[in-house]
Amino acid sequence: DCSEIKDAAEVSTALFWLFLAVALVGVVLNVLLIAFFVVAATSASPTFRAVRYLNPTFCILIAVGCIIALVALPLLGLNTAVASEGTMDGMCKAYPWLLSVAWALVFSCTAAKDVKLIIIFAKAQKFQRVTVSNLEMLRVVAPCLIIFIVFNILWIAIDPLELEWEEKDATTKYYVCKSDHTLVWAGVLYGLCAALILVSALCALRNWWIPSYLSETKVICAVVYNTVLVTCVVIPLYYVFEEEASLRFVLVGP
């Protein structure tokens, strides 16, 4: 019980508010980006012709994924000074959902955009004209989302996450969000995320030769490279410093 804790090793309240403020700025920027793509997608003006080549619908979905991640990451730093134990427990259960759905949206949509280019240029080489509708592109996104949703449902049903307080020493406790087999479930989730980002990277590499003004391939490859690099460093450190709440939050938050 939180009321019995003499000293809680929690994320610093100042650090939480700082990261929340940064996340809110990111959310506002993504909302503005969504508004821009909505205008571009619905406008008949030739000014937005180049933007329409970028598939505004899927750019919007990517921005939505980013917003979900931006909302989820600061909430990982909730502590007893800013939230009740019930709220923290709810966030504990929601966190895998939010991050996995955000990940699935971002990288399945980037893969879908590249798959569209692969199909178009493959047909063009045979002198065939082809159009790929948004509905056809959603056939790439939907299975990815379904896989992650089914996984999270199984995790909740079989081995639900709980917020627990563990002793750091005789007078200090820290809270952890875990289940009986957290490492197994987290390992599978990381594996699914790695598989999705690998597919996204392979699709982008297939389009490497396409000029930058027709494709975001090089940008996608840079995003994938940076994501993999940061993840490979952050995830091991996150589990090594289990008792250092603020340090773990700084590692994951950015």
State where each predicted segment sits.
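Alpha-helical multi-pass membrane domain signature
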Residues: 2-254
